[in-house]
Amino acid sequence: MPKDEFTVEPIEGLPERPPSGELILWQGRPSKLALARDALGLYWVAGYFVLLALWRIGVSSASMPVSEALPLGLPFIILGAATCLVLFAIAWVLASTTVYTITTARVAMRIGAALTVTLNLPFSRILSADLAVGSDGSGTVVFQTAGDVRLSYLVLWPHVRPWHVRLTCPALRSIPDAANVAKIFAEAAETRIGQPEIEARDFDAVAAQ
């Protein structure tokens, strides 16, 4: 399944050219901001530091004027901004080094910044898929693979269903226009082997799982 990739890709995102008759239907990568939000908790971190700043200002304003207490919250805002910048930089690297591919026969995921691997998932090894779409249209397509397929959560992260360590489910994470990508996958899989089950689920519920 995963294979190290040390050679030049003949086609971006694929370690070798598809066999005769296999066509590329879609290629894409995660949205950088959506990946930072969904996988790295960017908004939660930002909110945490804002609350710290408000708490510091609130406590200090009990013993001094609010105008003097306001600057005391500034260090938390600066630290929070720096932390969010680091998280976004990590998401930028992860997204930039990722290429997802859907062909007429499989889903391929070229992932990894330091160690690049390519995961090939033939439609015959995909039991079902879940679709989670956010308000901005970006979302995640999660694949449940056959029981004999063993995948490493750490190697695939963040391209997995969050927190499902024992039963790792690979995912096309934080992709733009996720509903359309899921439709492309479903139609291709139906043509190949019969339609797999695609369940539309609440985005926050899937992200929390």
Predicted ranges, named:
Residues M1-T7, E22, T118, A129, ...:
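Membrane-proximal intrinsically disordered regions of secretory-pathway and membrane-system proteins
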Residues P2-G28:
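Short, charged cytosolic
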Residues S20, G47-L51, N120:
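Long, distal/terminal scaffolding or interaction modules
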Residues W26, V107, V181:
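Residue-level signature of catalytic and energy-coupling elements of molecular machines
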Residues L33-T97:
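Alpha-helical transmembrane spans
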Residues T83-S128:
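Conserved beta-hairpin
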Residues I111-L151:
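Acidic, Ser/Thr-rich low-complexity segments on the non-lumenal side of membrane proteins
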Residues S135-Q209:
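A membrane-cytosol interface segment of integral membrane proteins
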